[in-house]
């Protein structure tokens, strides 16, 4: 593409985290280095602590030096956080709340992007019939820093002496507008369809979302907008997932629907995610730290590798290079290589490290037609 520059140097903050995090992040960095060698891109990797690893070494799940490093970088690549070792700590200093949720808030990463992709090579791994799942390509956009999860929470005793609880759901116009606008922009670059998922028949906050979305729609006449209640959406994702292109929703609904969507692909070991604030983003696999297989070279690094691909696309403005990573992953799967979580009869079992090697080798040696679709 003429006039396009994807040479860097790009500064990437790498946060291996806990459990299988260090193993899978190592393979993603390996693939990025191979891409750099192939395409002449300079990556400068900085390493920091987060989660349980940070608690063990610094006493807090998100050290200030990690935040400062992030402010100097173009993007953050994260492995995974958490594990039973830290489950008995107070919630605010556990790896998840004090590390992952806090870094999202510190960098105001307001939009979570999760692609739901169909891999023909894994059609038997999905719980849905192949004729339902075939061709599915959904991008879920979840608001990430507002709503119930971040509102005031309290317990109290009523005048009648009964225990009661309040969780507060608050959204500002700005919080809604920025994530909805991102959804429209993404839909423009895809198939031109946006579905706002809510509960507007019950919730005032959902009616607020609809009003703002309807106004923004006027700026995007080329995007088809539809509305769907969250309960119906949960059903439609199973009955007819191909109807969706871009789904936009608030924090809690998005939390549930993105997990449901992750099952469609057949393995959460394949699904990446991005949490964005404009061009800056944090990229991570959607799966957890899997402490039961940590250190055994069994983990599937493909979701982390594909997260690095998303980083190239959304933060570094390198869409062609992102596509190269995605094609390399697809080529490795087509050749029958599998980690244990997606192993099928007739396929070849490889370790975490070997899978990273295979994708890196595919990037360095693979020959791709630029017009070849994924």
From Swiss-Prot:
Protein name: 3-isopropylmalate dehydrogenase
Record function comment: Catalyzes the oxidation of 3-carboxy-2-hydroxy-4-methylpentanoate (3-isopropylmalate) to 3-carboxy-4-methyl-2-oxopentanoate. The product decarboxylates to 4-methyl-2 oxopentanoate.
Catalytic activity: (2R,3S)-3-isopropylmalate + NAD(+) = 4-methyl-2-oxopentanoate + CO2 + NADH
GO molecular function: 3-isopropylmalate dehydrogenase activity; magnesium ion binding; NAD binding
Known partners and oligomeric status: Homodimer.
Keywords: Amino-acid biosynthesis, Branched-chain amino acid biosynthesis, Cytoplasm, Leucine biosynthesis, Magnesium, Manganese, Metal-binding, NAD, Oxidoreductase
Chief place of localization: cytoplasm
Binding site for Mg(2+): 231, 255, 259
Species: Carboxydothermus hydrogenoformans (strain ATCC BAA-161 / DSM 6008 / Z-2901)
